Amino acid sequence: MRRLLILTLAALFLVLAACAPKPYEPAGEPTGNAALDDAVLSLLQERCSAKNSEQENLRAVYDFIAHDITYRPGTADMSGGFSDELTEQLALELLHKRKGNCDAQAALMAVLLRRMGYEAQLVQGTFVREEGAEPVDHAWVYALVGGEGVYFDPLYGGSFAERAEDYCMAPAALLKKTHQWDENALR
């Protein structure tokens, strides 16, 4: 009787273990920056699910930056563009402080997308907040998703509620209404 109970419990344990949700395993490579890689993996496993579609996981990451990160005005020295080192530094700082400018938000978005297995590139350009206004320097992300080039701009997707647009997997045509950039510079 005791042996039957043990076998039954063991079988039940195996069934439960097989049914347990599997953690999200990103397809991309880590950056090599241990602190950043640990924080990114933790965030992805918290926000994404192996059961979700690709679009649902991309939306979850975008929404995290758009809604859980506070905008802090400021500029980084972008004279040399977004080097890997600067991108990683901005992303890690943003994860720790939970506030940052468009450069930091774009850097984190790119790092997360790359870790998820997508080709992602930071874009520098300008943004016009309202018709007739002067353009301001701005940064966002271009990525290949399902073979299609799309854009992510979490800053104007959440932090500026009066101006909120859905720039998650946005086509170029949508961004061209307010964003300006050199499309020839994109890979």
Protein language model regions, located:
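Low-complexity, Gly/Ser/Thr/Pro-rich intrinsically disordered linker/tail segments
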Residues: 165-187
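Secondary-structure boundary elements
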Residues: 30-96
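Repetitive helical segments and hydrophobic/amphipathic motifs
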Residues: 11-12
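Hydrophobic/aromatic-rich core segments of domains that either
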Residues: 63, 104-173
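Positively charged n-region of N-terminal signal peptides that target proteins for export
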Residues: 1-4
